[in-house]
Amino acid sequence: MTTLAIDIGGTKLAAALIDNNLRISQRRELPTPASKTPDALREALKALVEPLRAEARQVAIASTGIIQEGMLLALNPHNLGGLLHFPLVQTLEAIAGLPTLAVNDAQAAAWAEYHALPDDIRDMVFITVSTGVGGGVVCDGKLLTGKGGLAGHLGHTLADPHGPVCGCGRVGCVEAIASGRGMAAAARDDLAGCDAKTLFIRAGEGHQQARHLVSQSAQVIARMIADVKATTDCQCVVIGGSVGLAEGYLEQVRAFLMQEPAPYHVALSAARYRHDAGLLGAALLAQGDTL
């Protein structure tokens, strides 16, 4: 059965057709609308989906935010241009005329990456470092979503009680410091206004402030991973997202993690499916692969 998979992120929307063998075809992307209105997101999704829907039999959505009974609830509204509530499943069913499933994007990506691991791995955590910071937890071969859909939102754990206010309302969240948006917000002087991609470029050129911002992000993520190891005793952690997959970033995270006491060390690897992990995980779940 062909699935029309959609990934809704803070900076881009992606869609593709995925068959039962996880082959991807006709991948398309659009920028996530900056408008705070539901109509803007609805129209962007319609433009993304219309060319693909005739060949699909179902829709699977991986979206940033919390998914509750088909509704998209933004824990950090800044990641979706201020959007707080959006009837995601209802909207896509109306656009595509197909049965629709929705799941958090990091949870979906965790499920895809779990399937790429050796069979003896039953406990893993996926962490995405991108516009925001998210995660997905697989425990004893089962994806944890939680009754309220909050499971795996690791970016909203505490990094610094004196840190910046996060869009979720807490102070000093991992996401507020380590995410691409958090790094950009902390940039000063000649880096003010630069996005995360530019900060990585400048860091590669030796710019001291840019190098500090990248290093600080990696250290915060490493400390969070130590907390995750203590909480879940996972066998491995997989890192994805535009920041997480940036050149040299994983190596910095690994170096900082090795500075933690040995019980908190855990194997780290880059996401095998890279930026397609959310699409593939959502398709797997829609196809009934829930173990």
Curated annotation (Swiss-Prot):
Gene Ontology MF, one: N-acylmannosamine kinase activity
Annotated Zn(2+) binding sites: H156, C166, C168, C173
PROSITE patterns per the UniProt record, alphabetical: ROK
InterPro entries linked: ATPase_NBD, ManNAc_kinase_bac, ROK, ROK_cs
One of the Pfam families matching this protein, by short name: ROK
Positions bound to ATP: 5-12, 132-139
Enzyme Commission number(s) of this protein: 2.7.1.60
Reactions it catalyzes: an N-acyl-D-mannosamine + ATP = an N-acyl-D-mannosamine 6-phosphate + ADP + H(+)
Keyword Kinase part of the UniProt annotation: yes
Keyword annotations: ATP-binding, Carbohydrate metabolism, Kinase, Metal-binding, Nucleotide-binding, Transferase, Zinc
Pathway(s) it belongs to: Amino-sugar metabolism; N-acetylneuraminate degradation; D-fructose 6-phosphate from N-acetylneuraminate: step 2/5
Presence of the UniProt keyword Lipid metabolism in the record: no
Gene Ontology BP, a term: N-acetylneuraminate catabolic process
NCBIfam families associated with the record: NactlManKinNanK, PRK05082.1
HAMAP family: ManNAc_kinase (MF_01234)
Family per similarity comment: Belongs to the ROK (NagC/XylR) family. NanK subfamily.
Function of the molecule: Catalyzes the phosphorylation of N-acetylmannosamine (ManNAc) to ManNAc-6-P.
Assembly description: Homodimer.
Protein name: N-acetylmannosamine kinase
Taxonomic source organism: Salmonella typhimurium (strain LT2 / SGSC1412 / ATCC 700720)
Organismal lineage: Bacteria, Pseudomonadati, Pseudomonadota, Gammaproteobacteria, Enterobacterales
